[in-house]
Amino acid sequence: MKFCSSCSAPVNKRIPADDSRERHVCDACGTIHYINPRNVVGSIPVYGEQVLLCRRAIEPRHGYWTLPAGFMEIGESTSAGAARETQEEAGAIVEIGPLYSLLNVPHAEQVHLFYLATMTSPDFQAGDESLEVALFNEQDIPWNEIAFPTVKQTLEWFFADRASGVFSSGLEFGVRSREILPTEKI
């Protein structure tokens, strides 16, 4: 950040009074700019025993497979954002279920949230950010072509939980959570 969004004057990085972290501060108007992580919201769209994945048409990781997800928009909830991204990227209408995974990606200044989702029909089509969209059984997922560690981790947790009967037991389950390190590779 170089300029203040309030008055357009240049900003400087310093620790403001009564704070403990370096921030972008405008010396002209006194505005302190807090740079916060961005939320990436998505879903695990399920139809029967299959999961819907999208092959990315954009960078980063062009040509790799991912769950439908993207940046949360101002004015929407995380679950509404997950449903919107699923429709935009995969052309699928879903009923959003509970939050399933929360993955912290501090080196990318992001938090990834994935919701369980049930497709309302078998209809789907690639959106502008997807080369193709397909339903996969667990054994057919192209595991070596998954775009991001957060997606791979979420899918691994999902299939392990499904195999253990967590989803069919009717019992409450906790949100899966962990931090993704910058050194993690697919």
What is each of the regions a protein language model found here?
Residues 72-157, 161, 165-167, 181-186:
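Unchanged
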Residues 5, 12, 27, 52, ...:
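Nucleotide phosphate-binding site architecture
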Residues 21, 38-40, 46-48, 60-62, ...:
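Short connector loops at helix/strand junctions that flank enzyme active sites
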Residues 165-176:
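Short, flexible loop/turn segments with low-complexity composition
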Residues 1-42:
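Acidic, metal-coordinating catalytic segment for phosphate/diphosphate chemistry
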Residues 46-88:
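Conserved Nudix-box catalytic region and its N-terminal flanking loop in Nudix hydrolases
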Residues 45-46, 53, 117, 135:
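Conserved hydrophobic "DFG−1" position in protein kinase catalytic cores
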